């Protein structure tokens, strides 16, 4: 995390790499940074995975197979994701976002490779 000061207050707030990535409006930039994070195999914690997953809607105008594959890979890196996903699927909003943005054929292709 990186320190960040606000112009209006003197308090410090820590920002994650993902916070900084998603501050940029350029969708291709976001996709490239996420790709670099995965490509260089940086440790992605479960909170970061969840944060990234819930920000997937910011990628939706850019319907890119590779971005979705990267995000699916992030999700699959955590062993507890299957259990977490099952619980989250009870929430219709989560389920519709998951089904819209990461299809099971993409997940299967990652598991096979």
UniProtKB/Swiss-Prot annotation:
Q: Which organism is it from?
A: Vaccinia virus (strain Copenhagen)
Q: Give the protein's recorded name.
A: Protein C21/B27
């Amino acid at each position: 995390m990186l320190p960040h000061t606000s112009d209006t207050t003197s308090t410090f707030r820590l920002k994650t790499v993902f916070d900084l990535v998603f501050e940029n409006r350029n969708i291709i930039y976001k996709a490239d940074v996420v790709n670099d994070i995965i490509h260089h195999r940086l440790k992605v914690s479960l909170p970061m995975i969840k944060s990234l997953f819930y920000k997937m809607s910011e990628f939706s105008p850019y319907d890119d197979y590779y971005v979705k594959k990267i995000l699916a890979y992030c999700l699959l890196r955590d062993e507890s994701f299957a259990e977490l996903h099952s619980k989250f699927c009870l929430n219709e909003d989560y389920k519709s976002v998951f089904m819209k943005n990461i299809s099971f054929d993409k997940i299967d292709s990652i598991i096979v490779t």
